Amino acid sequence: MYKRQVLTFQLSNDFHVRKVMTNYLPNDEESKHYACLLQWDNIYYQPETSETLPAKTTVRVGLVQWQMRGYRTIDDLFEQIEFFVDAVSGYKSDFILFPEYFNAPLMAEFNNLSESQAIRGLAGYTDEIRDRFLQLAISYNINIITGSMPLQRDGNLYNVGFLCRRDGSYEMYEKIHVTPDETKSWGLSGGSMLKTFDTDCAKIGVLICYDVEFPELSRIMADQGMQILFVPYLTDTQNAYSRVRVCAQARAIENECFVVIAGSVGNLPRVHNMDIQYAQSGVFTPCDFAFPTDGRRAEATPNTEMILVSDVDLDLLSELHTYGGVRNLKDRRRAVSYTHLTLPTTE
């Protein structure tokens, strides 16, 4: 009876049974020579590293709710970009997020071309835009998620963006699911690369707009240890925005991570297929006692150009994974585990 009480106490305090051992104590007749090997995970343990400073646990994110306006040159565009980078970095932010297709005003230069040719003209700026962002990341000591822009590769056109780290390195991410309009009007192809990114303060993922509406993508990144998911988006109407926003909140709950979204506002009367935009950028959290009850950490004013700065506490995620009211990550069955379910037959 005493041993049963001890085991009950241990299991109620998050010890986990790793295996049952036989012939552990041959002389212990009461236990029939059985023993349980238990494990307790110390979520606060930090392994020794060669880093001089400890890893950050509170990360500051900055969002740009971008106003679409006419820019005649790439220099005009980056005058506005640098203004926002300067402003957000002034608040000691670790990240700044720009929206999807923030550089669309430059397509006005190609108004004499068809929509599919105009977007390819815009793709001609992508390498220079990436390089300029990288210089800003270094100069202002901030990690930049560049939203998204078109990229031509091997005869196909993709919707991509870049993580420009403040240490001078960069990596690319791709939009996996392109919208029907992107396919019809611009001839875009869906990408195939999905990964998480290590940074100096968090492991992050990026999903471009429509991709956040497919839970499998963020689930893969959550399995890779993603702590913050960034979602640059471009939506024209409030119902389109609601799809992105509601799905973003769902991703925060089911993957026990922070989700940061940023979009564009205003209109571009001189750019085909980019008439109007609607956005309300925000930072979303899981829903548990340590987080806002509605899962909204911070939100921008709808349809107004502004920046939004918010802190997110990574330690809260670690505690949630183990001690949360519910534990979506630990309790989620892998896809193969659902093969036993009885599904209705179709005739």
For each predicted feature, which ranges?
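Short hydrophobic/aromatic beta-strand or adjacent loop that forms the aromatic wall/cage
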Residues: K32-L37, Y158, L194, I276-A279, ...
